[in-house]
């Protein structure tokens, strides 16, 4: 089996015991299986939930807290307990672990996003096993990842993973709830995530987790768009992750055909960047960009909205108002208003400018 880069996401329900603490048995089972992946020569990144579930009982809560301050306090206690347990277990296999705590804002800021990319690359090159969790103790509720499902998809794209394995307490996707319907049909393979498939997944999470099957399907769709195939399911024993790579996993495989990966810069533009303004273009420019992969030039710009600086991301629309994509603009809004509609040869070189593209095709993403 060729060396692969694997991202494994383990949810709260697959880690915590019935009382809310860390299940030593389950955690040891996961670590043994992850160590087997490393033993087979694969690079592994672990996305783990469980900080809140691990910490709430230590603070005296009888059950998982429902308030934001309660959840964040539990996460502050539980994250250290969770990491300590992982580190001790991985040490038995001679594996060095590294902790990264991320929030949504880390992805929206280009510099921090690039730093995360560089750090993960160096850790993997050094044969360490990165363990990533959302920084639950400071995350804003409206900016969370959904039990780390979406975080796992975004990280899998960031590191150009070959596969994302989302492990949960359900063995795959069904056409109806298998716990309530004996005739529920299981999907063993899905070539893509369609609207019909998305509608089958419920929103409810488990008692100890916040991400239901809907968030896992959404994560799978995002991972596929980034060129990463996905497995959603469950399993036990040391060989469970290796079995997934062999096509013998107990769950649903999603889009396991080779995909074209998206470059890091374009991932950031497409999924994480904040839009600072809007550029309207004529029909000729829209066709050149979308159908022929050309850069956007000032001649095709018909209107500029907002106040943005050089390097900020802007949305591009047709004269009918249809959004066709977004990209990093090489002009400020003020500069672009001065040169919109002009031919390149008619524009005076300003400052250190060496090119006239408004948005270069390498910094453009179609929507």
Swiss-Prot record:
It catalyses: L-glutamate + ATP = L-glutamyl 5-phosphate + ADP. Residues 276-350 form the PUA domain. GO terms for biological process: L-proline biosynthetic process. GO terms for cellular component: cytosol. It comes from the Bacteria. Gene3D superfamilies: Acetylglutamate kinase-like, PUA domain. Pathway: Amino-acid biosynthesis; L-proline biosynthesis; L-glutamate 5-semialdehyde from L-glutamate: step 1/2. Substrate binds at residues 49, 136, 148. ATP binds at residues 9, 168-169, 210-216. It is found in: Cytoplasm. It holds the Pfam family PUA. Keywords: Amino-acid biosynthesis, ATP-binding, Cytoplasm, Kinase, Nucleotide-binding, Proline biosynthesis, Transferase. Its EC number is 2.7.2.11. GO terms for molecular function: ATP binding; glutamate 5-kinase activity; RNA binding. Belongs to the glutamate 5-kinase family. Catalyzes the transfer of a phosphate group to glutamate to form L-glutamate 5-phosphate. This is Glutamate 5-kinase. It comes from Bacillus cereus (strain G9842).
């Amino acid at each position: 089996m060729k060396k692969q880069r694997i991202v494994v996401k383990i949810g709260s329900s697959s880690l915590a015991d019935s009382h809310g603490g860390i299940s030593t048995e389950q955690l040891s089972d996961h670590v043994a299986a992850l160590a087997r992946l490393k033993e087979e020569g694969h690079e592994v990144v672990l996305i783990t939930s469980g900080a809140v579930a691990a910490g709430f009982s230590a603070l005296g809560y009888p059950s998982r807290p429902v308030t934001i301050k309660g959840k964040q306090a539990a996460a502050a206690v539980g994250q250290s307990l969770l990491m300590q347990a992982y580190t001790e277990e991985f040490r038995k296999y001679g594996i060095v672990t590294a902790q990264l705590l991320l929030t949504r804002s880390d992805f929206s800021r280009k510099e921090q996003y690039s730093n995360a990319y560089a750090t993960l690359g160096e850790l993997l090159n050094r044969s360490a096993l990165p363990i990533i969790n959302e920084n639950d103790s400071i995350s804003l509720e409206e900016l969370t990842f959904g039990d780390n499902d979406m975080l796992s998809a975004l990280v899998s794209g960031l590191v150009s993973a070959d596969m994302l394995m989302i492990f949960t307490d359900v063995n795959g996707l069904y056409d109806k709830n298998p716990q309530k319907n004996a005739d529920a049909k299981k999907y063993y393979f899905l070539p893509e995530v369609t609207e019909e498939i998305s509608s089958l997944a419920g929103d409810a999470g488990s008692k100890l987790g916040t991400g239901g099957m809907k968030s896992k399907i959404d994560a799978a769709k995002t991972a596929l768009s980034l060129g990463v195939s996905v497995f959603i399911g469950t399993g036990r024993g040391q060989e469970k992750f290796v079995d997934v790579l062999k096509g013998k996993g107990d769950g649903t495989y999603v889009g396991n055909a080779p995909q074209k990966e998206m470059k890091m810069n374009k991932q950031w533009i497409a999924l994480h960047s904040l839009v600072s303004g809007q550029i309207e273009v004529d029909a000729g420019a829209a066709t050149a960009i979308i159908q022929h992969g050309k850069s956007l030039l000032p001649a095709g710009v018909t209107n500029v909205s907002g106040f943005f600086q050089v390097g900020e991301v802007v949305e591009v629309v047709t004269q009918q108002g249809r959004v066709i994509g977004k990209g990093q603009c090489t002009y400020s809004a003020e500069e672009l208003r001065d040169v919109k509609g002009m031919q390149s040869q008619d524009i005076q070189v300003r400052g250190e400018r060496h090119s006239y593209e408004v948005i270069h095709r390498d910094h453009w993403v179609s929507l």
